[in-house]
Structures are given as structure tokens and as C-alpha cells.
A protein has these predicted regions:
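Conserved donor NDP-sugar-binding/catalytic core segment of glycosyltransferases
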Residues: 93-126
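Short beta-strand-to-loop acidic/aromatic patch adjacent to the donor-nucleotide binding site
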Residues: 77-87
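Short, well-formed alpha-helical segments that are part of the catalytic scaffolds
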Residues: 7-20
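Conserved donor nucleotide-binding strand/loop of the catalytic core
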Residues: 40-63, 67-75
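A conserved acidic beta->alpha catalytic loop
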Residues: 17, 24, 32-41, 88
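A short, conserved alpha-helix in the catalytic core of glycosyltransferases
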Residues: 153, 158-170, 175-202
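Non-catalytic, C-terminal membrane-associated alpha-helical segments of glycosyltransferases
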Residues: 219, 223, 237-301
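Short, flexible, basic/aromatic active-site loop/helix in glycosyltransferases
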Residues: 131-152
């Protein structure tokens, strides 16, 4: 399942490599976030086997992944969903390796995260899944036997997600739009289920440059602040103690973002508005957000 917005060239590369998998996906779903570059037409012409979900307005990555996971689970009755961005270019064995790790682990596994590298083979720092820290010896042994290690959160760049976990713990929160939607979703799911990082399942995250943890968010700092506050206020992704630790880490990161920003005025504005909206509001229901984008969720969500 791929979410796209106005990156038809990268999307074409992504879909071409999905076709080239040694173990091809049974079904491919693309959520087109109201692209204006002809993405849907290109898919219909070059990849007629793909199920295209075209939204009438851009719902952001959060809305796109919510709609795509629902489509895969409800319409196609998937057992496992491989979710990714449109600038994710999988290596030929990526899916086979994800499935091998999932099968080797056994019951209780909610998701498997890929190793994400840049075009030169170096790891993308922002896409290295976080270790749970307090994982038990048994969990670490099970992850090691499956060729990986335990994780607490991961990114939507490339995730294999068990459908039962999606049904049980819910879809991503669509109202996040961008930033922290994958952080919240995977943390919520992995508060209850298990997750592992599978380093043999390699994908290329074809960004313009190698990412760093000190990315300058600019105006998107609003989404970073508001959404992080929403995550910690909701209480579904983290318990009180873990949330306290994460809040401290977030504040340290915000200070670093600000220090390295090229537009600190925009950062200050984004922080003030994000703080205000994060404390005064809560996310709208995913059903409401997707309905505005032209996608109707099934009643059970």
C-alpha cells in the first residue's frame, strides 16, 4: 500500500520495484492524495493491476495511510499490509525478507520494519526504528531468532503490519495530516503487540539528500508541536512514565530544531500555534477527516 502526492516519477519507480519483488504483493493499493500531476492516469495506464483510491482533497500522509490501511483490510481482506511512502524504492527481496522475519517470529507480532537506506547505501538516520529499552530477554531472543531486534516505534517509509493488529488497535489518526502520525500509530500498536526491525529487508528512501535528526521543519513545526502534544494528551500510545520521558526528549529536540533553523521566526510562530492548538483541541475523528477527502470508512472503524 503506497501513499502518494504529486511525485509521479518516484511513484513509478516504487511501483516498478513492487512488480520486481521476488515475492510479489498479492494486491497493490495506491492512495492518491488529490495529486495534480497526472499520477492516477499514469497508474491506470502503466500499472492497470493497481487499486487506486483517489481522494478529492489532500489528507496528508496521515489521512492517506488511514484510507490505505482501511482499503487493504476491508476491501481486499489482507492478512498483512506492506505500507510505504511513494519515495520508497524497495530492493527486490524486501518483501520476502519482511515475510521471512514475520513467519520466523511466530504469534504476537504486530509489525516488522525495514532497514531504510539512502541512495548511497547509508542508513537514513530518521528512519532507524527506536528500541523499546526495557524489552525482556525473551522478546530480544525471539527478535534475534527472526533476524532482527525489538522496536518501540517506526516510520511509514516501509512497514509490514499484521491486519489483526490494525483492526484491534485502530487506524492512524488522520487529523495529524503530516508529522508524528506514524510515531503515534506504531507506538499505540506496539504498546500491546510486538514489533521488530528486520535489517535484511532493505528499502531505499529516495529523498533529495540524506536525512538528519536535525531537520529544519520550517512552517511544519506547527504540526510537529501540535501532534506531539496530541500524542501525549491522548494517553493511548504511552503510559504516564514513558510519556514523561518522551516529553522531555521532544522538548530537547525542539530546542535543537530551533537552534539550527534558518527561519527562527517561523519556528517561534509554529511553536506558539502548535502549543495553543495541541492544548485546546483534540484530533477530529478519522472518519470525519476521510469523509471530507471523499473516503467513507466502514462502520466498524
Amino acid at each position: 500500500m503506497v501513499v502518494t502526492w504529486n511525485r509521479v516519477k518516484l511513484l513509478t519507480e516504487c511501483l516498478t520495484m513492487l512488480r520486481a519483488q521476488t515475492r510479489r504483493p498479492d494486491v497493490v493499493v495506491v492512495v492518491d492524495n488529490a495529486s495534480t500531476d497526472g499520477s492516477s492516469d499514469v497508474i491506470h495506464t502503466q500499472f492497470p493491476e493497481v487499486d487506486v483510491v483517489r481522494l478529492v482533497r489532500n489528507a496528508g500522509g496521515a489521512g492517506g495511510f488511514s484510507a490505505g490501511l482501511a482499503e487493504a483490510v476491508d476491501v481486499h481482506e489482507a492478512d498483512l499490509v506492506w505500507a510505504m511512502d511513494d519515495d520508497t524504492i524497495p530492493t527486490e527481496t524486501a518483501l520476502a525478507e519482511l515475510l521471512a522475519s514475520f513467519t520466523a517470529y511466530g504469534p504476537g507480532l504486530g509489525l516488522v520494519a525495514s532497514r531504510v537506506v539512502w541512495t548511497d547505501g547509508r542508513d537514513q538516520p530518521r528512519n532507524i526504528p527506536r528500541d523499546p529499552g526495557r524489552a525482556s530477554k525473551a522478546d530480544r531472543r525471539a527478535a534475534h531468532a527472526a533476524g532482527g531486534r525489538p522496536i518501540r516505534t517506526a516510520s511509514f517509509v516501509s512497514l509490514l503490519i499484521e491486519a489483526g493488529a490494525i483492526r484491534k488497535y485502530g487506524l492512524p489518526t488522520a487529523d495529524f495530516f503530516i508529522w508524528n502520525d506514524d510515531f503515534e500509530f506504531t507506538a499505540r500498536l506496539l504498546r500491546h503487540a510486538k514489533g521488530i526491525y528486520a535489517p535484511k529487508a532493505v528499502v531505499v528512501h529516495k529523498t533529495a539528500e540524506l536525512g538528519t535528526k536535525l531537520v529544519d521543519p520550517g512552517e511544519r513545526f506547527y504540526n510537529e508541536v501540535r501532534n506531539k502534544i496530541w500524542v501525549f494528551r491522548a494517553g493511548e500510545a504511552f503510559g504516564p512514565l514513558e510519556a514523561g520521558v518522551r516529553v522531555g526528549a521532544a522538548m530537547r529536540n525542539w530546542a535543537l530544531f530551533y537552534r539550527h533553523s534558518r527561519d527562527q521566526a517561523a519556528m517561534r510562530s509554529g511553536f506558539k500555534m502548535g502549543l495553543r492548538d495541541g492544548l485546546r483541541t483534540r484530533p477530529r475523528s478519522t472518519r470525519e477527516v476521510l469523509a471530507e477527502a471523499g473516503y467513507d470508512l466502514a462502520a466498524h472503524w
